[in-house]
Amino acid sequence: MGTLLLEVTMLKNKFFPLLILVSVLLSLISYLLNLYSDWLFFDETGFSSVFTTTLYAKTGAGLLFGGLLFLFVQINLHVANRAQFPLSGMHLLGAGNLGINRDQAVRLCKPVSMLVSFVLALLAGNLGAMKWKDLLFFANRLTVGTVDPLIGKDVGFYLFSLPLLDAVKGVSGFIILAAAALATAVYYVRGGILLTERGVAIDEKVRRHLAVLVGIFACAVAAGFYLDSFKLLYADNGAFYGAGYVDVNSRLLTYRVLTFLTPLAGAMLAIGIWKGVWRMALLAPAIVVALYMLGIRVYPGVLQKFKVAPNEMALETPYIMNNITATRFGYDLEKIETVPFDVDTKLTAADIANNDATIKNIRLWDHAPLLKTYSQLQQIRTYYKFFDVDNDRYMVNGRYSQVMLSPRELSYADLPSKNWINERLIFTHGNGITFGPVSRISKEGLPEFFVKDIPAVSLADIKVSRPEIYYGELSNEYVIVKTNVPEFSYPTATGNITTTYAGTGGVPMDSLLKKALFAAKFRTEKILLSSDITKESRILYNRNINERIRTIAPFLHFDSDPYLVVDQKGRLKWIIDAYTHSTRLPYSRPLKGGINYIRNSVKTVVDAYDGSVDFYISDPDDVILKVHGRIFPKLFKPMAEMPGDLRKHVRYPHHLLQIQAAMFATYHMTDPKVFYNKENLWEIPVLGDKAMEPYYTIMKLPGEKAEEYILLLPFTPSKRDNLAAWLTARCDEPQYGKIRAYTFPRDRLIYGPKQIDARINQDSFISQQLTLWSQRGSEAIRGSLLVIPIEKSLLYVQPLFLAADKAGLPELKRVIVAFGDQLVMEENLELALQRIFGGKKAAPAATSGVSADTQASPATLAKEAVSIYEKAITLQRQGNWAAYGEELRSLEQILKKMAR
């Protein structure tokens, strides 16, 4: 039995290194295969230089950090392993039961320590490789031309140098501690450190070696204190961000003293360890710790409580100003022009007629109901899916129109027959778009279309010549095109229409090596064995547009809402906004994720058919993008090179204005005293439990001659519901990117969205109608409440949708309009406006609020009331509850007139 166990043990000992070697080789092969497939992808998209630059940076950073650790640790282990100590042959403490004596352990010391240091070097190298962007930033850094107001460093130091210095500091400390720990372990094994009954006995050679490491570590700690002084500029001081009075007059001074004192204390500690004078050794770090606690923790609290708190406004004013200036720069708020908006309620029917383009482009269709409606009317087959609806503007039949557009993508989860050939060779792409106006409604309450169906039927001068969507938001799987199997294009009544890919996207499958590579990458032997794949075939992967652009440019932050446009040639192109950002701008207030600097510097375009990607520079003044341009000179193109037909569809990002609005609500106050007292703090209105979001519309801005596409968001004063201002970002050239804040008089009440919402909820007629619809089994869905500035007045518009149930088809059945004290609900926007402003006679409809008295006599009014009552009773018997409710509303108005 014992012999058998011995043989098993010998076999394990023999094959264990082989298993490790095989595992390492397999991991290496897998890594190289992925690396090669990534290179093929970058080569296909024309960005191979980005791949090589990134690869060199990651490799260089990994070798630098890992190599430094391995070299430093090996030098220290070499010194430790050369040392000779007595007492060889004695059992190690705690290892006697294992049968390990010191001689055996000493022989294992070198290989084990080598292995451990190699593993630690791999860890450090991996951490270093993750800092490749910081390394490239440092190597290509630029000056901004603006210095921080406290230390006087150029802002470029914080953006491009400090991140790498922080990483070097952290890795340096880890390297020194790793060397000290491994050297200590070797000394213990070799007998340089003994555990005796009287305590720990440390040989003189060991003490000298560790003393040197302690001195080096003290220098690393001092460097850390030096870098920590810069981080004071990111401090959260409650009322503002950045270094304040206490930071400047206590913590900054302490960090500077500690930076100078810590190396001296480290030298004292090293000398104490070298000589074995432990009191001297412990005194030095005790002084540093005491000074740190006193200057960083204790004294700042005392200073804050007894000096700053009673005089905070006076003492913190210059630092508040620093915070205001930096935050306005960080979020590009300086470009926002503030304009007074002297609102009135004098809007007339003539004004409505003069702003016809604005009225016709008020968005009545909400994204969620429209997406559900599109899905039920235009999905065509279960394997097609509408993922999102986007806003844009086009010249449609000669009119500048806001439209809603949704791509019809392929949903692999809903394929009727799931097998490899169907999923990878036949069903390869989505097909076409659904495209319609934002405000037009059919008699049934359904959206109208400019482009619909498969193949695309265009009811306007918008033509889609290349409707296939190979690259989209739902294209998460690889496909192989140009095979012997025809691709499915679209269904017809007589059968399916097929197609063959004619684009240049994807990687050619022109060799056995590539087939083997992708078979391994996607873990299927079918790619290697399929006879349908020829040398002309191409494999399309990274087809999800979000994944695609993030793979190419992971250093950019991309918007979560790509939108599809139709260019002049009828091709479908995705436009995705890209941002540069940083967490390192001094004194700037951060977002929740830590970002305190952001610019929309890049517009990304992806062709939905061939997957080609272009990055266009939309903000050439952004210093971070300038550094990216130095790192990747072939990545970005000037905005002037973007085709003119695509530039017409560039829009100001919803996400960016949302961020800027959140900051501008506070940082429009540029006077430190007003800022400190929050005298004019704004908020983004909240309806229900959700804050309003910016929305696109076409309108004529005050003082402008023509309508334009804008992004708009209102503000209310803090903890109040009336309007304070509205923010607008312009989207059309040549005014693109200009932002205005139109402010209302503070001494007048201007109804805000929440107040209008409350009035709608309290309106007896609207409540009655909602109740009637509910009793009939319909679900009423109130759409977004929009504020529409026209001339010097404000209109509020809210659509009302009806659905048979939660899964039913939403129909736009009513439009609610509020103006001043008037509130109406009608079947469409035109009728609602006619009820308020007059003009063409509208059908009898609901209206509430102040209206002009008629000259009718009481007898005439009484006859009219009786007539309306009889009509209402007839409608009630017929079960026409909607018309019945309208007649009751009209009766209510007549009775009110009679009462007056």
Swiss-Prot record:
* Record has Transmembrane as a keyword: yes
Q: List membrane-spanning regions.
A: 15-35, 60-80, 112-132, 174-194, 210-230, 257-277, 282-302
Superkingdom classification of source: Bacteria
Entry keywords, A to Z: Cell membrane, Membrane, Transmembrane, Transmembrane helix
Pfam families (alphabetical): UPF0182
* Compartments (UniProt record): Cell membrane
Mode of membrane association = Multi-pass membrane protein
Give Gene Ontology CC terms.
Answer: extracellular region; plasma membrane
Q: Which PANTHER family match?
A: UPF0182 PROTEIN SLL1060 (PTHR39344:SF1)
UniProt xrefs under HAMAP family: UPF0182
Family membership: Belongs to the UPF0182 family.
* Entry protein name: UPF0182 protein Ppro_3567
Instruction: Give the organism, scientific name.
Output: Pelobacter propionicus (strain DSM 2379 / NBRC 103807 / OttBd1)
